Amino acid sequence: MAYVIIDTSSILFGIRYNKDVFKSVNEKYPQLKQLISYGVMSELEKMASNKGTKANEARTALKILRHKNLKVDNKSEYVDSWILDTASKNANSLVITNDTKLFKNLKSKGIETKKLSKSGELR
């Protein structure tokens, strides 16, 4: 099955700029199931336990994720490794990430990868 795999960085980027990464994905790729890893939830929970702007963004992200109909993969490995492995094993999947290092790594392996822009577009 093909998925749109969404990374923590894109979720937080969307919140920071009042853009809904899930809506953008749905509009551009309605035929693909959205997928995140348990590790994304763990990263957000860890961030949310702190104070400051990033913690507030993480809390907002968690509230949003709890109301979305997303598939959550229960593997608890490091998120970037999970994304690379999952995208490699599922043909025609693509990844949404605003993490520059991960973006370049995925692209170098031939995996379709997009970033969420400040305007809410996937590029």
Where are these regions (language model features)?
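Nuclease catalytic cores that cleave nucleic-acid phosphodiester bonds
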Residues: V40-R123
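Domain-level signal for Mg2+-assisted phosphodiester chemistry and nucleotide/NA-binding surfaces
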Residues: M1-H67
